[in-house]
Amino acid sequence: MVSGVRIRGQEHLPVEDASIVVSNHNSHLDTMVLMSLYPVSRLPKVRPVAAFDYFMKNKYVAWFSQNVIGIIPLKRKVSKDEGHPFAPVHTALENGETIIIFPEGSRGEPEEMKSFKTGVAHLSKDFPDVPVVPIYIHGAGKSLPKGEALFVPFIIDVVIGEALYNKDESHKAFTARLEEKIVQLELTYKERE
């Protein structure tokens, strides 16, 4: 990484076994920042979920994204014939891998959060014993904002919260709790700055 990364709450990040890492999303750097939290030995099992339509449209980007970064390409719209959209994510979790997912669905404006979609709640319902780790990232949206190609070095802050589990909550209730937790992490960051 060219930017510096300050981390709070590293002790909350599981580095073995399956987990679902969830964060706000303002930049392509977000994925690299989250991957940098793990030891090199774990990286082959850290799998970012990424938009198929964006990362698979160019064969060079597709190759790099799948073979170097290890993305799980996910189609935003799936026909019934194509099966369950989360099938490859389920397989990764069953194999003890770490999933990185951004519940806003796509990158937003720098330092602004959009409402969360319910995908993580579906995963957490299917895998109730897998920890859902909430993370707030600040600064990546300034370093490499959406739509920009020029990187500007900034300090990027990462605040990791305690894991959440979904035993019997509705998708809507769990999503609201997860979103509130990441907003709380944002407030914690702002109070200390």
List PLM regions with ranges.
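Alpha-helical membrane-targeting segments
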Residues: M1-G4, K57-I69, L144, E148-P153
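Helix-to-loop junction immediately C-terminal to a conserved catalytic motif
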Residues: M1-H25, E94
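Short, flexible loop segments at the rims of nucleotide/cofactor-binding pockets, characterized by
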Residues: M1-V2, R76-K80, E111
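Catalytic core of membrane glycerolipid acyltransferases/transacylases, capturing the structured
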Residues: V15-V78
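Short coil/turn segments at beta-strand junctions that form active-site/ligand-binding loops
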Residues: D17-A18, P44, N95-E97, V130
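N-terminal/domain-start segments enriched in small and hydrophobic, helix-friendly residues
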Residues: V22, L29-L37, A51-F52, K57, ...
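A cross-family acyltransferase "interaction/gating" segment
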Residues: T98, P110-K172
